[in-house]
């Protein structure tokens, strides 16, 4: 159990190191107005904090820096929310300034604003398309042989495919087919569409449309939509601006991981609990991220959780500011999506 004095010194060390990036010594601490202690007393307390594993010595300075254990204690027990500036709030509101027709676009815009506000790398995981439900199908003829099939989901996800129209299918049959699809398939999850088409719609088409089968096969093929969530990055190279990553050899494995994306996809899939989650350094269980922290939050429509947004930065991250911003964006995103997609 840390004493009040040790808690104060630990907090000031971490706050100072986050601001400056420089190891903190007893002389620096003795000049802080909030610490009315002698250098000798501070040195003794710092020695105890080091022995307990909350701070550690660097090879290049007599000062101390926070350890992972120190950051974890700081995040869990010493952090206080930071007030957002008017400019911060205005930028967050700009995400929702326009009516949202495609959920993916607003998620992508959220990632960009998060990166702009924090100067770190932001990642957003969109909703899994397989969770989407069909809102409508349109087929727009381009000429006698080709048309564009448009599939729109309840979350605004849009898929466009150019298809070949069989010579045996005339425009009125095509229109009739689309009407039957929209009458019988609206609200069906995309993952179930093919099954429903063959079990419930094919018989109806057979009764009303001659030579329906070749066109049906063409439309069914357009429903092969990727099932995984889409992932959006913003500020991919922002980590290069952090002093701890001046050594390109140190940052190269992380940058490679960011470019390949699949490890981040798996990582974000794990972070699906409600509320803010902070994983620090080796807690991420990836060697490329042992000098990084990941802060995540989920967003939803009503009670239905849709995806995850995250900030990736150095362990020397501005936790208070980032958590406040991320919490606000996740909350505002959920409120806006619920209003637009659930309540119309």
UniProtKB/Swiss-Prot annotation:
GO terms for biological process: negative regulation of DNA-templated transcription. Keywords: Repressor, Stress response, Transcription, Transcription regulation. InterPro entries: GAF-like_dom_sf, HrcA, HrcA_C, WH-like_DNA-bd_sf, WH_DNA-bd_sf, WHTH_transcript_rep_HrcA_IDD. The keyword Transcription regulation applies. GO terms for molecular function: DNA binding. The keyword Nuclease does not apply. Disulfide bonds: none annotated. Negative regulator of class I heat shock genes (grpE-dnaK-dnaJ and groELS operons). Prevents heat-shock induction of these operons. The gene is hrcA. Gene3D superfamilies: 3.30.450.40, Heat-inducible transcription repressor hrca homolog, domain 3, Winged helix-like DNA-binding domain superfamily/Winged helix DNA-binding domain. NCBIfam families: hrcA (TIGR00331). Belongs to the HrcA family. This is Heat-inducible transcription repressor HrcA.
